[in-house]
Amino acid sequence: MGNTHGSKIQRKFTMEFLNNVPFNIQVPSSLRDPKDVTFSIDQLQNLQTIDDARNIALKYLHSCSNFASVWNSNTIHPETRRLMRMLIQIQTINAVCNAFYRLLDNTRIQLHADMMANAALNTKQYSNNYQYDTSRQQRSYDQRTKIFVVNGDCLDIVSCFREKYQNCSPVVLNMASATCPGGGWRHGCGAQEENLHRRTNLFQCLEDSYQQLVGKRNWNYPIPEFGGIYSPNVSVFRGSEARGYPFFPNGPEYISFIACAAYAYPSTTINKDGEMELYGSDVIHNTMKKMETILKIALDNEHDTVILSAFGCGAFRNPPRHIAKLFHKLISEKYSQSFKYLIFAIIDDHNSMKSHNQDGNIKPFADIFNEPILSLDEF
C-alpha cells in the first residue's frame, strides 16, 4: 500500500514536471540536430502556432539574414513577432541541451556543458540583509569612474568593450522580473530579460527548467526587494534581435549577470519643471536602494565595470529622467571611484516614446550625466 502511494506521488511529480518543461521540449527525446536547408522567409511570415515555431526551430538550420529580413519589416503582425521569438528560444534550448549548435554551413560549434552547468550551480541569490564583504565594498581607484551612455544592445556592448579593454571585468545588469524567472521568456515577450534568455543559457541559471539543481541550491524566487541574483560566466552565443539572432561563429563568450527587479508601475507625479518623477519619499529611497544593490553585488564579485541601463524605464514605466538623476546621485555620492567604468546601454524600443518617456530613454541619461550618446562603433 505504501509503495503504491509513493508511486502515485512520483507519477504526479513526473507529470507536473513534464507538463512544465518549456515548449514541451523533453530531454533528450525532443532534441534534434538540424541539418536541413534553412527556413524560408515565407515560413516565418506564415507562422500560425507554437507548433509551427517548434517544428521549424528543430528541423532547419538558422538563417539570421532571413530572420532579420522578416523581423525588420514594418508589416509583420505582432503575433508573428511573438512566434518568431519563441522559435529562437526553442533553438537556444535545443542548442544548450545538446551542448552544440550548427552554423548555416553545417559547421558544428560546441557549447561546454560543464561551463553551463557550473554557471547554473553557482548562481547565487542575495537576500535583503546580506552581509557584504567590507573590504570589497570599500574598493577605490585613483581615477574617477568613467561613465558612458551608449545607444546599443547590452551584449553587443559588453563584447565590444572586452575587445577594447581586455584587462577589465564587466558584469551586465539583467532588468529582471521579481516574481517570474526570466519574465515572459516562454511566451515570446520582448523586454531585455527575455532577450537575454534567447541568447544565453540563463534559463538554466534562473528557472532550472529541467530540475537539474534540485537539492543543490537553497533559494527560490521571488527576488528579494533589495536583493538580487548573480550568475557567473553564463554562456552567450547569439547576437542581437535586429541582426537576426546569429549564432556566434567562434563559439560562446562567458559573461556574468546581475538580476535585479525595478518597481513596476510606480506612482508618479509632475514636478514644478513639468517633469515626471517618482512619487513619494519611500519609493524614491527604495529605488535608490535597489540601484545600490546592483553595485554592491558587482563589487562583491570583484567586477570593475558594470553594464547598466534605463532601470525599469521600459515596460515597468519608471520615468527615465528621474531614474537617471537617482543613479547620478548614488554614483556621485558613494561610488565615484569604486569602478573603472559604468556603461548605460540603452535602446529606444517599442516601450519608448510613451507617456512616461516621451523623449525616449537614452536622451535623459545623456543629459543628466552630461555625456554624449555613443553608437557601438564610436564606443
Which residue ranges define each predicted feature?
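Macrodomain-like recognition of ADP-ribose-binding/processing modules
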Residues: G2-V306, A310-F379
